[in-house]
């Protein structure tokens, strides 16, 4: 499922303006995504989240990211992420494959 190289291109085009992925990377408009998988929503240390994000209480996984990345504002009403989402399932699969590799050791 998914192509990490294609996912990296999607990340650069649609995500990198607001997010970093490397360990110790700085927060931008959005949080650094290192350690994303297995972490609860709203828990990246040092980032100021909305209550909606903190209170959602789901664990980030391939499944939850598939749903979230399709329509972030529907999945977490009140999130400050202004991204409209990625409608194509194959693009979400590629992006998640890339994130899985890029955000963990």
Swiss-Prot record:
Subcellular location: Mitochondrion intermembrane space
Tissue: This is one of two isocytochromes C found in the testis. The other is identical with the form found in other mouse tissues. These cytochromes are assumed to be located in the sperm.
Main location: mitochondrion
GO cellular component terms, semicolon-separated: mitochondrial intermembrane space; mitochondrion
Keywords, ordered alphabetically: Acetylation, Apoptosis, Electron transport, Heme, Iron, Metal-binding, Mitochondrion, Phosphoprotein, Respiratory chain, Transport
Membrane spanning residue stretches: none
Residues in coiled coil: none
Any one GO MF annotation of this record: metal ion binding
Post-translational modification note: Binds 1 heme c group covalently per subunit. Phosphorylation at Tyr-49 and Tyr-98 both reduce by half the turnover in the reaction with cytochrome c oxidase, down-regulating mitochondrial respiration.
Binding of heme c, residues: 15, 18-19, 81
Keyword tRNA processing: no
SUPFAM superfamilies per record: Cytochrome c (SSF46626)
GO annotation, biological process: apoptotic process; hydrogen peroxide metabolic process; positive regulation of intrinsic apoptotic signaling pathway
Modified residues (N-acetylglycine): 2
Family recorded in the similarity comment: Belongs to the cytochrome c family.
Entry function: Electron carrier protein. The oxidized form of the cytochrome c heme group can accept an electron from the heme group of the cytochrome c1 subunit of cytochrome reductase. Cytochrome c then transfers this electron to the cytochrome oxidase complex, the final protein carrier in the mitochondrial electron-transport chain. Plays a role in apoptosis. Suppression of the anti-apoptotic members or activation of the pro-apoptotic members of the Bcl-2 family leads to altered mitochondrial membrane permeability resulting in release of cytochrome c into the cytosol. Binding of cytochrome c to Apaf-1 triggers the activation of caspase-9, which then accelerates apoptosis by activating other caspases.
Protein known as: Cytochrome c, testis-specific
Source species: Mus musculus (Mouse)
